[in-house]
Protein backbone atom coordinates (compact mmCIF):
# COMPACT_ATOMS: atom_id res chain seq x y z
CA UNK A 1 0.00 0.00 0.00
CA UNK A 2 1.36 3.45 -0.92
CA UNK A 3 1.89 6.05 1.75
CA UNK A 4 -1.43 7.84 2.18
CA UNK A 5 0.34 11.05 3.25
CA UNK A 6 2.62 11.20 0.19
CA UNK A 7 -0.15 11.94 -2.28
CA UNK A 8 0.26 15.44 -3.80
CA UNK A 9 -3.41 15.42 -4.82
CA UNK A 10 -6.66 13.85 -3.57
CA UNK A 11 -5.90 10.38 -2.16
CA UNK A 12 -8.22 7.62 -3.27
CA UNK A 13 -10.73 6.94 -0.48
CA UNK A 14 -9.57 3.51 0.61
CA UNK A 15 -12.80 2.79 2.46
CA UNK A 16 -14.16 2.09 -1.03
CA UNK A 17 -13.52 -1.62 -1.42
CA UNK A 18 -14.42 -3.47 -4.64
CA UNK A 19 -16.13 -6.09 -2.46
CA UNK A 20 -19.25 -4.93 -0.63
CA UNK A 21 -19.58 -7.99 1.56
CA UNK A 22 -18.00 -11.43 1.65
CA UNK A 23 -19.40 -14.55 3.27
CA UNK A 24 -16.84 -17.31 2.98
CA UNK A 25 -16.14 -17.96 -0.71
CA UNK A 26 -19.15 -15.87 -1.78
CA UNK A 27 -18.54 -12.17 -2.41
CA UNK A 28 -20.79 -9.35 -3.57
CA UNK A 29 -18.83 -6.94 -5.78
CA UNK A 30 -19.73 -3.35 -6.59
CA UNK A 31 -18.96 -4.09 -10.24
CA UNK A 32 -21.54 -6.85 -10.50
CA UNK A 33 -24.07 -4.85 -8.49
CA UNK A 34 -23.55 -1.95 -10.89
CA UNK A 35 -24.67 -4.07 -13.82
CA UNK A 36 -27.70 -5.31 -11.88
CA UNK A 37 -28.71 -1.76 -10.93
CA UNK A 38 -28.28 -0.56 -14.51
CA UNK A 39 -30.34 -3.38 -15.99
CA UNK A 40 -33.12 -3.07 -13.40
CA UNK A 41 -33.28 0.70 -13.83
CA UNK A 42 -33.57 0.33 -17.62
CA UNK A 43 -36.32 -2.25 -17.17
CA UNK A 44 -38.23 0.14 -14.88
CA UNK A 45 -37.64 3.12 -17.16
CA UNK A 46 -38.82 1.27 -20.27
CA UNK A 47 -42.08 0.42 -18.52
CA UNK A 48 -42.58 4.05 -17.47
CA UNK A 49 -41.98 5.27 -21.02
CA UNK A 50 -44.31 2.62 -22.43
CA UNK A 51 -47.18 3.99 -20.33
CA UNK A 52 -46.84 7.38 -22.08
CA UNK A 53 -48.33 6.32 -25.40
CA UNK A 54 -48.37 9.85 -26.82
CA UNK A 55 -44.56 9.72 -27.03
CA UNK A 56 -44.53 6.90 -29.56
CA UNK A 57 -44.99 6.56 -33.29
CA UNK A 58 -48.70 5.87 -33.93
CA UNK A 59 -49.12 6.07 -30.11
CA UNK A 60 -47.97 2.46 -29.93
CA UNK A 61 -45.02 1.59 -27.64
CA UNK A 62 -43.04 -1.44 -28.87
CA UNK A 63 -42.83 -3.02 -25.40
CA UNK A 64 -45.57 -3.42 -22.83
CA UNK A 65 -44.84 -4.39 -19.23
CA UNK A 66 -44.95 -8.12 -19.99
CA UNK A 67 -42.63 -7.93 -22.98
CA UNK A 68 -40.25 -5.63 -21.12
CA UNK A 69 -40.00 -8.21 -18.34
CA UNK A 70 -39.39 -10.96 -20.89
CA UNK A 71 -36.69 -9.00 -22.68
CA UNK A 72 -34.73 -8.01 -19.57
CA UNK A 73 -33.36 -11.57 -19.28
CA UNK A 74 -32.14 -11.53 -22.88
CA UNK A 75 -30.72 -8.04 -22.46
CA UNK A 76 -28.75 -9.18 -19.41
CA UNK A 77 -27.36 -12.15 -21.34
CA UNK A 78 -26.43 -9.93 -24.27
CA UNK A 79 -24.66 -7.44 -22.02
CA UNK A 80 -22.75 -9.96 -19.91
CA UNK A 81 -21.88 -12.56 -22.58
CA UNK A 82 -21.23 -9.97 -25.28
CA UNK A 83 -19.28 -7.72 -22.93
CA UNK A 84 -17.05 -10.53 -21.72
CA UNK A 85 -16.48 -12.05 -25.16
CA UNK A 86 -15.72 -8.57 -26.44
CA UNK A 87 -13.07 -8.16 -23.75
CA UNK A 88 -11.61 -11.55 -24.65
CA UNK A 89 -11.75 -11.35 -28.45
CA UNK A 90 -11.46 -7.61 -29.14
CA UNK A 91 -9.09 -6.40 -26.45
CA UNK A 92 -6.86 -9.14 -25.09
CA UNK A 93 -7.17 -12.50 -26.91
CA UNK A 94 -3.54 -13.46 -26.22
CA UNK A 95 -3.90 -13.15 -22.45
CA UNK A 96 -7.13 -15.13 -22.29
CA UNK A 97 -5.78 -17.78 -24.65
CA UNK A 98 -2.95 -18.31 -22.16
CA UNK A 99 -5.27 -18.01 -19.12
CA UNK A 100 -8.57 -19.60 -20.23
CA UNK A 101 -9.85 -19.95 -16.66
CA UNK A 102 -9.90 -16.13 -16.43
CA UNK A 103 -12.52 -15.87 -19.16
CA UNK A 104 -15.38 -16.50 -16.74
CA UNK A 105 -13.98 -14.25 -13.97
CA UNK A 106 -16.41 -11.43 -14.72
CA UNK A 107 -16.37 -10.39 -11.05
CA UNK A 108 -12.76 -9.25 -11.46
CA UNK A 109 -13.81 -6.68 -14.06
CA UNK A 110 -12.98 -6.68 -17.73
CA UNK A 111 -16.12 -6.05 -19.76
CA UNK A 112 -16.05 -4.46 -23.19
CA UNK A 113 -18.74 -1.87 -23.90
CA UNK A 114 -18.48 -2.54 -27.61
CA UNK A 115 -18.88 -6.28 -27.05
CA UNK A 116 -21.87 -5.65 -24.79
CA UNK A 117 -23.37 -3.41 -27.47
CA UNK A 118 -23.03 -6.17 -30.06
CA UNK A 119 -24.53 -8.73 -27.67
CA UNK A 120 -27.46 -6.47 -26.83
CA UNK A 121 -28.01 -5.67 -30.52
CA UNK A 122 -28.25 -9.38 -31.33
CA UNK A 123 -30.74 -9.83 -28.46
CA UNK A 124 -32.83 -6.87 -29.67
CA UNK A 125 -32.97 -8.10 -33.28
CA UNK A 126 -33.88 -11.64 -32.22
CA UNK A 127 -36.56 -10.49 -29.76
CA UNK A 128 -38.05 -7.93 -32.14
CA UNK A 129 -38.37 -10.45 -34.96
CA UNK A 130 -39.83 -13.09 -32.67
CA UNK A 131 -42.51 -10.69 -31.40
CA UNK A 132 -43.05 -8.78 -34.66
CA UNK A 133 -41.77 -5.50 -33.19
CA UNK A 134 -40.30 -2.65 -35.23
CA UNK A 135 -36.55 -3.15 -34.74
CA UNK A 136 -35.71 0.57 -34.83
CA UNK A 137 -38.37 1.36 -32.23
CA UNK A 138 -36.95 -1.44 -30.10
CA UNK A 139 -33.45 0.01 -30.43
CA UNK A 140 -34.79 3.39 -29.32
CA UNK A 141 -36.53 1.87 -26.32
CA UNK A 142 -33.42 0.15 -24.99
CA UNK A 143 -31.11 3.06 -25.82
CA UNK A 144 -33.22 5.46 -23.74
CA UNK A 145 -32.23 3.87 -20.42
CA UNK A 146 -28.80 2.49 -21.31
CA UNK A 147 -26.72 5.58 -20.38
CA UNK A 148 -27.84 5.44 -16.75
CA UNK A 149 -26.46 1.91 -16.42
CA UNK A 150 -23.24 2.94 -18.16
CA UNK A 151 -22.82 5.76 -15.65
CA UNK A 152 -23.29 3.41 -12.70
CA UNK A 153 -20.77 0.89 -14.07
CA UNK A 154 -18.19 3.65 -14.67
CA UNK A 155 -18.49 4.62 -11.01
CA UNK A 156 -17.80 0.96 -10.20
CA UNK A 157 -14.68 1.18 -12.41
CA UNK A 158 -13.56 4.02 -10.13
CA UNK A 159 -14.23 1.94 -7.01
CA UNK A 160 -12.25 -0.93 -8.57
CA UNK A 161 -9.37 1.49 -9.28
CA UNK A 162 -9.21 0.42 -12.91
CA UNK A 163 -9.10 2.36 -16.18
CA UNK A 164 -7.64 5.39 -14.41
CA UNK A 165 -6.48 8.50 -16.21
CA UNK A 166 -3.19 10.00 -17.26
CA UNK A 167 -0.95 11.98 -14.93
CA UNK A 168 -2.15 15.55 -14.36
CA UNK A 169 -1.90 18.54 -12.04
CA UNK A 170 -5.58 19.53 -12.08
CA UNK A 171 -6.97 20.33 -8.60
CA UNK A 172 -9.26 17.29 -8.65
CA UNK A 173 -6.52 14.79 -9.55
CA UNK A 174 -6.62 11.51 -7.63
CA UNK A 175 -3.80 9.30 -6.38
CA UNK A 176 -4.99 5.71 -6.75
CA UNK A 177 -3.61 3.42 -4.07
CA UNK A 178 -3.25 0.56 -6.57
CA UNK A 179 -1.15 2.72 -8.89
CA UNK A 180 2.47 1.52 -8.51
CA UNK A 181 3.70 5.05 -9.29
CA UNK A 182 1.15 6.69 -6.96
CA UNK A 183 0.93 9.79 -9.13
CA UNK A 184 -1.94 12.30 -9.38
CA UNK A 185 -4.18 11.20 -12.24
CA UNK A 186 -7.35 12.23 -13.99
CA UNK A 187 -10.31 10.35 -12.45
CA UNK A 188 -11.26 9.43 -16.01
CA UNK A 189 -13.79 6.85 -14.82
CA UNK A 190 -15.84 9.70 -13.35
CA UNK A 191 -15.50 11.74 -16.54
CA UNK A 192 -16.92 8.77 -18.42
CA UNK A 193 -19.68 8.26 -15.85
CA UNK A 194 -20.74 11.83 -16.48
CA UNK A 195 -20.30 12.08 -20.27
CA UNK A 196 -21.22 8.56 -21.39
CA UNK A 197 -23.71 8.06 -18.60
CA UNK A 198 -25.72 10.62 -16.73
CA UNK A 199 -25.43 13.63 -19.07
CA UNK A 200 -26.25 11.44 -22.06
CA UNK A 201 -29.26 10.04 -20.20
CA UNK A 202 -30.51 13.60 -19.67
CA UNK A 203 -29.93 14.49 -23.34
CA UNK A 204 -31.93 11.47 -24.51
CA UNK A 205 -34.73 12.19 -22.05
CA UNK A 206 -34.85 15.77 -23.33
CA UNK A 207 -35.23 14.81 -27.00
CA UNK A 208 -37.77 12.12 -26.08
CA UNK A 209 -40.04 14.42 -24.09
CA UNK A 210 -39.39 17.81 -25.72
CA UNK A 211 -39.08 16.72 -29.36
CA UNK A 212 -41.05 13.44 -29.33
CA UNK A 213 -38.00 11.63 -30.76
CA UNK A 214 -39.66 8.20 -30.40
CA UNK A 215 -42.02 9.22 -33.21
CA UNK A 216 -39.08 8.93 -35.62
CA UNK A 217 -37.82 5.37 -34.89
CA UNK A 218 -34.04 5.28 -34.91
CA UNK A 219 -33.53 8.85 -33.69
CA UNK A 220 -32.93 8.00 -30.03
CA UNK A 221 -30.68 5.03 -30.82
CA UNK A 222 -28.73 7.09 -33.34
CA UNK A 223 -28.28 9.96 -30.89
CA UNK A 224 -27.17 7.50 -28.22
CA UNK A 225 -24.41 5.82 -30.22
CA UNK A 226 -23.17 9.07 -31.78
CA UNK A 227 -22.98 10.71 -28.36
CA UNK A 228 -21.37 7.68 -26.75
CA UNK A 229 -18.79 7.45 -29.53
CA UNK A 230 -17.89 11.13 -29.18
CA UNK A 231 -17.80 10.96 -25.36
CA UNK A 232 -15.64 7.83 -25.46
CA UNK A 233 -13.25 9.47 -27.92
CA UNK A 234 -12.90 12.51 -25.65
CA UNK A 235 -12.43 10.38 -22.54
CA UNK A 236 -9.66 8.39 -24.26
CA UNK A 237 -7.61 11.61 -24.28
CA UNK A 238 -7.58 11.66 -20.47
CA UNK A 239 -7.40 7.92 -19.87
CA UNK A 240 -4.34 5.68 -19.73
CA UNK A 241 -4.88 3.62 -22.89
CA UNK A 242 -5.61 -0.05 -22.53
CA UNK A 243 -3.01 -2.23 -24.17
CA UNK A 244 -3.89 -2.12 -27.85
CA UNK A 245 -3.67 -5.25 -30.04
CA UNK A 246 -0.22 -5.66 -31.57
CA UNK A 247 -1.42 -5.09 -35.14
CA UNK A 248 -3.08 -1.82 -34.11
CA UNK A 249 -0.04 -0.62 -32.19
CA UNK A 250 2.15 -1.32 -35.20
CA UNK A 251 -0.07 0.84 -37.41
CA UNK A 252 -0.72 3.76 -35.05
CA UNK A 253 2.18 3.72 -32.58
CA UNK A 254 2.88 7.20 -31.25
CA UNK A 255 -0.06 8.79 -33.05
CA UNK A 256 -2.29 9.23 -30.00
CA UNK A 257 -5.03 7.35 -31.86
CA UNK A 258 -6.21 4.58 -29.55
CA UNK A 259 -8.07 1.34 -30.18
CA UNK A 260 -11.00 2.70 -28.17
CA UNK A 261 -11.21 5.67 -30.53
CA UNK A 262 -11.07 3.36 -33.55
CA UNK A 263 -13.92 1.22 -32.21
CA UNK A 264 -16.02 4.33 -31.66
CA UNK A 265 -15.74 5.58 -35.26
CA UNK A 266 -18.10 3.00 -36.83
CA UNK A 267 -20.57 3.67 -34.01
CA UNK A 268 -20.65 7.37 -34.86
CA UNK A 269 -21.09 6.67 -38.57
CA UNK A 270 -23.89 4.18 -37.95
CA UNK A 271 -25.57 6.64 -35.61
CA UNK A 272 -25.69 9.28 -38.34
CA UNK A 273 -27.14 6.67 -40.71
CA UNK A 274 -29.86 5.81 -38.17
CA UNK A 275 -30.86 9.47 -37.77
CA UNK A 276 -30.73 10.12 -41.53
CA UNK A 277 -32.97 7.11 -42.11
CA UNK A 278 -35.40 8.23 -39.39
CA UNK A 279 -35.87 11.68 -40.90
CA UNK A 280 -35.86 10.48 -44.50
CA UNK A 281 -38.79 8.16 -43.80
CA UNK A 282 -40.97 10.98 -42.39
CA UNK A 283 -42.38 8.95 -39.49
CA UNK A 284 -44.38 11.03 -36.88
CA UNK A 285 -48.05 10.41 -36.20
From Swiss-Prot:
Keywords: Cell inner membrane, Cell membrane, Membrane, Transferase, Transmembrane, Transmembrane helix. The keyword Ribosomal protein does not apply. GO terms for biological process: lipoprotein biosynthetic process. It is found in: Cell inner membrane. The keyword Transferase applies. Pfam families: LGT. It is a multi-pass membrane protein. It is an enzyme of class 2 (transferase). InterPro entries: Lgt. The chain crosses the membrane at residues 26-46, 71-91, 107-127, 133-153, 194-214, 218-238, 256-276. Its EC number is 2.5.1.145. One of its GO terms (cellular component) is plasma membrane. A 1,2-diacyl-sn-glycero-3-phospho-(1'-sn-glycerol) binds at residue 154. It comes from the Bacteria. Pathway: Protein modification; lipoprotein biosynthesis (diacylglyceryl transfer). One of its GO terms (molecular function) is phosphatidylglycerol-prolipoprotein diacylglyceryl transferase activity. PANTHER family: PHOSPHATIDYLGLYCEROL--PROLIPOPROTEIN DIACYLGLYCERYL TRANSFERASE, PROLIPOPROTEIN DIACYLGLYCERYL TRANSFERASE. NCBIfam families: lgt. Belongs to the Lgt family. Catalyzes the transfer of the diacylglyceryl group from phosphatidylglycerol to the sulfhydryl group of the N-terminal cysteine of a prolipoprotein, the first step in the formation of mature lipoproteins. This is Phosphatidylglycerol--prolipoprotein diacylglyceryl transferase. The gene is lgt.
Amino acid sequence: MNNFLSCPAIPFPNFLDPIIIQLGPIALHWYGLGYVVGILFSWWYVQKLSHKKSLWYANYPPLNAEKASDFVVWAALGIVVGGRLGQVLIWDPTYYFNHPSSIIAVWDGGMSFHGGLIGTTIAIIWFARKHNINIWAMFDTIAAGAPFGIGVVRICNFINQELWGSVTNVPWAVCFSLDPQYLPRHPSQLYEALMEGFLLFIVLAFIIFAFKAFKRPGTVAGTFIISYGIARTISEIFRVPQEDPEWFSALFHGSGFTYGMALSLPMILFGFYAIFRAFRNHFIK
